[in-house]
Amino acid sequence: MLGSKPRVHLYILPCASQQVSTMGDRGTSNHSEMTDFILAGFRVRPELHILLFLLFLFVYAMILLGNVGMMTIIMTDPRLNTPMYFFLGNLSFIDLFYSSVIEPKAMINFWSENKSISFAGCVAQLFLFALLIVTEGFLLAAMAYDRFIAICNPLLYSVQMSTRLCTQLVAGSYFCGCISSVIQTSMTFTLSFCASRAVDHFYCDSRPLQRLSCSDLFIHRMISFSLSCIIILPTIIVIIVSYMYIVSTVLKIHSTEGHKKAFSTCSSHLGVVSVLYGAVFFMYLTPDRFPELSKVASLCYSLVTPMLNPLIYSLRNKDVQEALKKFLEKKNIIL
């Protein structure tokens, strides 16, 4: 018995010292007792915070202007009352919403010394962002299918892409996003957090939160990987197959005007898909030992994509340009 006591004390003391040194004022390893997290943000010199704040402010202003403007144009112009613009309006709403989940808090943290976020706030941020980013992936797949029907079966377009089907596709996208978000959020916050409260990111994301856990992450990562495959593979397959048929059909069109019209809408959609999926793949394939690269990728799909989407669709789409001009003329902005 005497020989076993030192071994017991040697086991207990490092754990206690680790709790004190890494957890600070939290003083517990139980996630249910945790009251907040600290968003570490970017590892830059303090004097660069003002520059980052101005950059985030500019991007967020562009997101608000572009996406609110796009939704307003689509709702006010009868010529844009088509399935494609119904999907585009929902895409603008999603971009506006999920950027608003992240950016305001990130901008506040550039100025505030208190960079904490409440436990409930962190849960809400992860849940909403996961819901909306997955919904956007399914919505982009629905938009690819819409382009496939419009180009490959134009005579049946109004019949096949009915209002009911469009509503079902959008509702299904939100439903899939909600189910995925519930699973991801519940898995993340049932972990035991026994490391620092500091989340090495500018918002609450699942991977940085996993780094704070002392639980066995094998099963968690396997479920996350399976969930990602279930989400990403079907959407990518729908997009790729749709565009294979689209390209095959467009190549059979002999008129130059037909080529331009087909590629103008398709190239806009492909640009949005490329930016979003490219950033997502880059972020999740980046090893954990390079957290700064992961943050850069997160910036692409959380800030850059919502800013670029309205620009991509407006610059490459004559219908949107004409609707915007008509809207501005009504408001007497253009003399």
Swiss-Prot record:
The residue spans the entry assigns to the Cytoplasmic side of the membrane are as follows 72-79, 146-164, 243-262, 316-335
- Record-annotated membrane-spanning stretches: 51-71, 80-100, 125-145, 165-185, 223-242, 263-283
> Which residue intervals are topologically Extracellular?
1-50, 101-124, 186-222, 284-296
| Main location class | membrane
Give the way it sits in the membrane. Answer: Multi-pass membrane protein
Molecular function, one GO term: olfactory receptor activity
Q: Which Gene3D superfamilies match?
A: Rhodopsin 7-helix transmembrane proteins
Query: Could you tell me where this protein is found in the cell?
Result: Cell membrane
Query: What are the protein's UniProt keywords?
Result: Cell membrane, Disulfide bond, G-protein coupled receptor, Glycoprotein, Membrane, Olfaction, Receptor, Sensory transduction, Transducer, Transmembrane, Transmembrane helix
Recorded GO CC terms: plasma membrane
Here the disulfide bonds are 122-214
Residue positions the entry lists as glycosylated: 30, 114
Q: Which domain of life is it from?
A: Eukaryota
Q: What does the UniProt record say this protein does?
A: Odorant receptor.
- Spell out the family assignment given in the record's similarity comment: Belongs to the G-protein coupled receptor 1 family.
- This chain's protein is named Olfactory receptor 9K2
Gene field: OR9K2
